[in-house]
UniProtKB/Swiss-Prot annotation:
One of its GO terms (molecular function) is structural constituent of ribosome. This is Large ribosomal subunit protein uL24. CDD domains: KOW_RPL26. Keywords: Ribonucleoprotein, Ribosomal protein, RNA-binding, rRNA-binding. Part of the 50S ribosomal subunit. GO terms for cellular component: ribonucleoprotein complex; ribosome. One of two assembly initiator proteins, it binds directly to the 5'-end of the 23S rRNA, where it nucleates assembly of the 50S subunit. One of the proteins that surrounds the polypeptide exit tunnel on the outside of the subunit. The gene is rplX. It comes from the Bacteria. The keyword rRNA-binding applies. Belongs to the universal ribosomal protein uL24 family. Disulfide bonds: none annotated.
């Protein structure tokens, strides 16, 4: 904790470790305090939902569970890459370490 999190919401990422290794998805949410991300459709867990009223149905839902940021890599145009920063027109922008393109 305390490091800069280089992954942002809506980034395409590749899972590099764990049961979903090799799969890709978009980041739904970044949990900075615990260094984890929620990736759409990956690391699914079953969650029990209580019935709240007579019409409302309870049951078992599948929801995304957080993945540690060390287990994902941002996808550039040519594949997974590390992220660097560069100043362009007085603004700090994220760049692909492999190709130098702006992310």
């Amino acid at each position: 904790m305390g490091k800069t999190v280089k992954i942002r919401k809506d980034d395409m990422v590749l899972v590099i470790a764990g049961k979903d290794r090799g799969k890709r998805g978009a980041v739904l949410r970044v949990l900075r305090d615990v260094d984890r991300v929620l990736v759409q459709g990956l690391n699914m867990r079953k969650k029990t939902i209580r019935r709240k009223s007579a019409q409302d149905e309870g049951g078992i839902m599948e929801v995304e569970a957080p993945i540690h940021i060390s287990n994902v890599m941002i996808m550039g145009k040519k594949g997974p890459t590390r992220v660097g920063y560069r100043m362009e027109n007085g603004k700090k922008v994220r760049v692909c370490r492999k190709t130098g393109e702006v992310l």
